[in-house]
Amino acid sequence: MFYSGLLTEGGRKETDMREAASLRQQRRMKQAVQFIHKDSADLLPLDGLKKLGSSKDTQPHNILQRRLMETNLSKLRSTRVPWASKTNKFNQAKSEGLKKCEDEDMILVSCQCAGKDVKALVDTGCQYNLISSACVDRLGLKDHVKSHKHEGEKLSLPRHLKVVGQIEHLMITVGSLRLDCQAAVVDDNEKSLSLGLQTLRSLKCIINLDKHRLIVGKTDKEEIPFVETVSVNDDNTSEA
């Protein structure tokens, strides 16, 4: 019985020691968790902190997760700006390229109008002679502009141009030929003048793309060379 009592007492001591060690370990773990909890919270921006409690939404790792998502979304939005900028630059380059192609396809010839040198566009896509309001101002033809006869009639014009008047007697010299023709005045800032299909037919014009010549005249034909298609506006501005 004596030995049995000693063994029992020894077992109790061992059990007590194990329980004490377990309690110490639990306290250390609790302290470690509290430290991590507090340390993680301290690393967060102050404006993102709430009173930390038992709610999962207010735990540090959840707040950090939300912050990470917000940061990623912010980065995603910021990366869209350069892409939009690239798209705009691409569209601008594309538009400039199309405009350049259109300019290169234009046929221009030198002529005189109101005693001044002008680059006239040979426009087979329009029935009428067109002169811009800017060109009217440059040539001093404002007094010759009259209201459009058929105001209710909408002329079929390229580039959605708006007719603001007409000139009944516009004197144009092409080569050695003098023309007395009508022209519709359009609201346009470019200093341009164009010869429409009606006038080209009346002159029996032939467009020779191989020789870059506009052949005019019914009997005594005359060849008018094309001029470089830099820009109608630039050409006529330089002559002002």
Swiss-Prot record:
Q: Name one GO molecular function term.
A: aspartic-type endopeptidase activity
Domain of life, per the record? Eukaryota
Q: Name one GO biological process term.
A: proteolysis
> Which InterPro entries does the record associate with it?
NRIP_C (IPR033821), Peptidase_aspartic_DDI1-type (IPR019103), Peptidase_aspartic_dom_sf (IPR021109)
Q: Which PANTHER family match?
A: ASPARTYL PROTEASE DDI-RELATED, NUCLEAR RECEPTOR-INTERACTING PROTEIN 3
Protein's name according to its UniProt entry: Nuclear receptor-interacting protein 3
